[in-house]
Structure formats: structure tokens, C-alpha cells
Amino acid sequence: MAIQSKYTNTQVEALISELLAVLAKHQAPTDLSLMVLGNCVTHLLDKKVPGESRQKVAEQFAKALTQSVK
């Protein structure tokens, strides 16, 4: 069963495009890009996710990321 998102493909693709444009503007190599994006994820988890939920959300994110590259 497909996962339904509350966000449209247009919203998601627009953000992806802008983020990738910033990385390209700075000519960031892949390892730096991954490090920066990982730090952004950590920042969002720390600032936007309640402490009691943080570990579970991080695990779900890691699982989704792992499944997306299979």
C-alpha cells in the first residue's frame, strides 16, 4: 500500500529543487552535501520534535532513508 502524504508532489519537488540549487551554487561535493543535510535533519529533530518523540522519529527517518536507497 502506498504511503499518502499530506503534502503535494509540487510542494515536495519545489523544496528539493531549491535545496539542490543551494548545494550546486556552493559546488558542494557529495560528502559535504550529505553532512550538511544530515546536520539539518539533526537541527530539525532537536528544535521541532519533542524530546520524548525524538528517538522514535529519528529511527523512522533512518528506516525510510534506508528503504529509499534499496
Swiss-Prot record:
Transmembrane spans: none
Xref: InterPro entries: UPF0352, YejL_sf
Pfam families the record matches: DUF1414 (PF07208)
Homology family: Belongs to the UPF0352 family.
Name of the protein this chain belongs to: UPF0352 protein Sfri_2492
Provenance organism: Shewanella frigidimarina (strain NCIMB 400)
